């Protein structure tokens, strides 16, 4: 006899999404803060690895309660191409954005004296173009050489790759079951994407990861430039909408190009059903 497990409430799932997203932002932006104002010495690969491990730890923390989406783009894609309940979607997204905001706020609070010292030493005024150097500790801004359209395309492509591989790693029909290794492999995937494409857009791939910290820097004194990135258009819209488009494309591509072609077990027929002695029955 099997015992049915009680499913977590929606409020518990949202709390898990809040905590998981806050944790990954805490580790990721904390690493960048250490580099920018703390005197640490990290290369691109080390930063990408820390972001990836932070995501892995957040997944391990929350997967059993909420499924560890930790990303509105993932939640939206799963609501369209998987069995995630659409009624939960707005609550998950709000929890993820709030978690990202609080994770960034916690890092800012802990490093605040170092931020002030850096600004005084470099005669930096918040809200100016120069202050984007420190605002980028918390959220992403594109390489100046990229147009806005190119930045949008980069985020679409890398998020599509992220979503497609996430679906493959969590699909037990696709090769050997990944089980407890899946979060580590997802973290490694993020590190690989970050180390290869990070210099272009900062590899947001997550609307909450970018918008929540941008909101925090807006209130912390950076103001409007937090959202525009010093461009003529509100750049914050790019890492909000491009990952959503990319995640949906990645999920659709996995479903259409990979999942539908995976071998699946055929239902047993009467003629093929084994007898007690192990030999097949014949009609």
Write out the residue ranges for each language-model feature.
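Membrane-interface helix-loop junctions and terminal tails of multi-pass membrane proteins
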Residues: 1-283
